[in-house]
From Swiss-Prot:
Gene3D superfamilies: 2.20.150.30, Ribosomal protein L28/L24. GO terms for biological process: translation. The gene is rpmB. SUPFAM superfamilies: L28p-like. The keyword Ribosomal protein applies. It comes from Syntrophotalea carbinolica (strain DSM 2380 / NBRC 103641 / GraBd1). This is Large ribosomal subunit protein bL28. NCBIfam families: L28 (TIGR00009). The keyword Glycoprotein does not apply. One of its GO terms (cellular component) is ribosome. Belongs to the bacterial ribosomal protein bL28 family. Keywords: Ribonucleoprotein, Ribosomal protein. GO terms for molecular function: structural constituent of ribosome. It comes from the Bacteria.
């Protein structure tokens, strides 16, 4: 699946843009995903990881 973190499963969320006149239009917020070569399930793979997982140390980067 695209736009989903392979570690925590974070995915896009939806909501509304609300103007000053209180008009509403649909909006999608995407997670900040990075492609990283990492040790995942015992193999070195290129996975999509959100920056929160990268910063917290949930990912072991491959060299």
């Amino acid at each position: 699946m695209s736009r989903v973190c392979d570690i925590c499963g974070k995915k896009p969320t939806t909501g509304n843009n609300v103007s000053h006149a209180h008009n509403k239009t649909r909006k999608v917020w995407y997670p900040n995903l990075q492609k990283v070569r990492a040790l995942h399930k015992g193999k070195v793979q290129a996975i999509k990881v959100c920056t929160r997982c990268l910063r917290s140390g949930a990912v072991t980067k491959a060299i």
